[in-house]
């Protein structure tokens, strides 16, 4: 395993650990999820370019699009929770009335 792959794997595992540790605050969880998605994007792009599998070269771009959609929905939920309750605790998610 090269050092770049090792660093990206460690970045993904640190972001996953951050999600598990800071799961009570929505903002911290969203930042850690973005870190996970960014490390997955870079790892996929490097592996595809290294192995010359250009038939799946759209996969990192699709992952990036889904990551942007996830960030948009997460930030909208964060704004809704923070304006209604004044904090970003995840425990407030079950209190939202749709």
From Swiss-Prot:
GO terms for biological process: ATP synthesis coupled electron transport. It is a multi-pass membrane protein. Gene3D superfamilies: 1.10.287.3510. The chain crosses the membrane at residues 1-21, 28-48, 59-79. Keywords: Electron transport, Membrane, Mitochondrion, Mitochondrion inner membrane, NAD, Respiratory chain, Translocase, Transmembrane, Transmembrane helix, Transport, Ubiquinone. One of its GO terms (molecular function) is NADH dehydrogenase (ubiquinone) activity. It catalyses: a ubiquinone + NADH + 5 H(+)(in) = a ubiquinol + NAD(+) + 4 H(+)(out). It is found in: Mitochondrion inner membrane. It holds the Pfam family Oxidored_q2. Its EC number is 7.1.1.2. Its main location: mitochondrion. It is an enzyme of class 7 (translocase). GO terms for cellular component: mitochondrial inner membrane; respiratory chain complex I. Core subunit of respiratory chain NADH dehydrogenase (Complex I) which is composed of 45 different subunits. Belongs to the complex I subunit 4L family. PANTHER family: NADH-UBIQUINONE OXIDOREDUCTASE CHAIN 4L, NADH-UBIQUINONE OXIDOREDUCTASE SUBUNIT ND4L. Core subunit of the mitochondrial membrane respiratory chain NADH dehydrogenase (Complex I) which catalyzes electron transfer from NADH through the respiratory chain, using ubiquinone as an electron acceptor. Part of the enzyme membrane arm which is embedded in the lipid bilayer and involved in proton translocation. This is NADH-ubiquinone oxidoreductase chain 4L.
